[in-house]
Amino acid sequence: MLYDDFYVKSLIQTIEDWPKQGISFRDITPIFSDPKGMRMVVDAYVHRYIATDITHIACIDARGFLIAAVLAYELQKPLILVRKKGKLPGKTISQKYALEYGEAELEIQEGAVKAGDEVLLFDDLIATGGTLLAAIELLTSQGASIKEVAAIIDLPDLGGSQKLRDSDIPVFSLCAYDGE
């Protein structure tokens, strides 16, 4: 199905002052309840990545899982879950990163990636880039290389996509919004 930017953007809701005052939250959940919109989004990524040399798709907890799982299925690639600390069973490898007030930690299962793996890293949204940069550090520490970061939404005013590009990581998003 051909991608229609206007249609997909019409599904994304803006919730003002959530999760805190002054933030315009971009809610992608209506895409998941709209089969046409979901198909457009998935097909846009399938067409972009079907003829590439990616070997794995990694995705960030939790909304990144929803599109990435379908994309991994469509492209027949292994899916790597990048989760918050304590959410994965078995042996894990972790990476700490700074938050606005404190620190958080991401994990992948030991052996999820190895040297030579070419990874597409997927998340629902690019904001400040902190979580994505931590996920990149985690995956590359195991020898994988990041081919591209993909997201449904980019908030370029928050600087995350530029930080990724400054780190020589290509970035692709379907929609961009100004402001927070």
Swiss-Prot record:
Function: Catalyzes a salvage reaction resulting in the formation of AMP, that is energically less costly than de novo synthesis.
Family of this protein: Belongs to the purine/pyrimidine phosphoribosyltransferase family.
Entry annotated with the keyword Glycosyltransferase: yes
Pfam families reported for this sequence: Pribosyltran (PF00156)
EC numbers for this chain: 2.4.2.7
Gene source species: Marinomonas sp. (strain MWYL1)
GO cellular component: cytoplasm
Localization per Swiss-Prot or TrEMBL: Cytoplasm
Gene Ontology MF terms: adenine binding; adenine phosphoribosyltransferase activity; AMP binding
A single GO BP: AMP salvage
Coiled-coil parts of chain: none
Main location: cytoplasm
Disulfide bridge partners, by residue number: none
Reactions that this protein is recorded to catalyse: AMP + diphosphate = 5-phospho-alpha-D-ribose 1-diphosphate + adenine
Record's keyword terms, sorted: Cytoplasm, Glycosyltransferase, Purine salvage, Transferase
Assembly and binders: Homodimer.
EC top class named in words: transferase
Name of the molecule in the record: Adenine phosphoribosyltransferase
Pathway(s) where this gene product acts: Purine metabolism; AMP biosynthesis via salvage pathway; AMP from adenine: step 1/1
